[in-house]
Amino acid sequence: MATWAQFGLQDASSPLMEELTYFHDYALIVLTLITILVFYGLVSLLLSSSTNRFFLEGQELETIWTVVPAFILIFIALPSLQLLYLMDEVNNPFLTIKAIGHQWYWSYEYTDYNDLEFDSYMVPTSDVSLGNPRLLEVDNRLILPMQNPIRVLVSSADVLHSWAVPSLGVKMDAVPGRLNQTTFFAARAGLFYGQCSEICGANHSFMPILIESVPFSNFENWVAQYIEE
């Protein structure tokens, strides 16, 4: 979960988010070096008082400043493309969840079980219990088994929404009339907070996502208890 005055990314709780964090750091280092090099060149040019009136062309120099940036772009693009294909890969999901966006709440369906669906609304600030974050607590948490691949089918009942949980590296647009899919793998037990990440109206900021990752035995007990009720 994001904390006050946090400048970095949230702690990774899935293999995909770990890779995204690594790529972020890798790209940041490359861009920092490029910025320093360009800044050094500009300062050197401005402070230099010497000129060469007979320098009309430089084939070697033009080749260097064409080839070097091309190689830099390749080194940035390769890990980016690898992550892009990794995010779209769906291999034998253990459980499939359907998340539907509404103005302004989420509804969830466990497609592998009969009659296991519910709506998830934000808990008003006045009703939030001590220790729980405001604007992120919900009345019905999305309970999922840890250390199992989960597929999420995302859609919308009205306008554009976006189902996003940063610590799991998940973000998928909810488009009316269309079913998008994404997968994630919660590596540990805990609470993972997210929010709608597409402006969807007046209460866009008040439709949080709360995933509770639990051991599989606890998940089975919760499913049995929910179906009985």
Curated annotation (Swiss-Prot):
Cofactor: record remark: Binds a dinuclear copper A center per subunit.
Pfam families: COX2 (PF00116), COX2_TM (PF02790)
Protein's UniProt name: Cytochrome c oxidase subunit 2
Segments crossing the lipid bilayer: 27-48, 63-82
Membrane disposition: Multi-pass membrane protein
Residue numbers binding Mg(2+): 198
Gene3D superfamilies attached to this UniProt entry: 1.10.287.90, Cupredoxins - blue copper proteins
Location, primary (coarse class): mitochondrion
GO terms for MF: copper ion binding; cytochrome-c oxidase activity
Similarity remark: Belongs to the cytochrome c oxidase subunit 2 family.
Mitochondrial matrix-facing ranges: 49-62
Organism of origin: Paracentrotus lividus (Common sea urchin)
Gene: COII
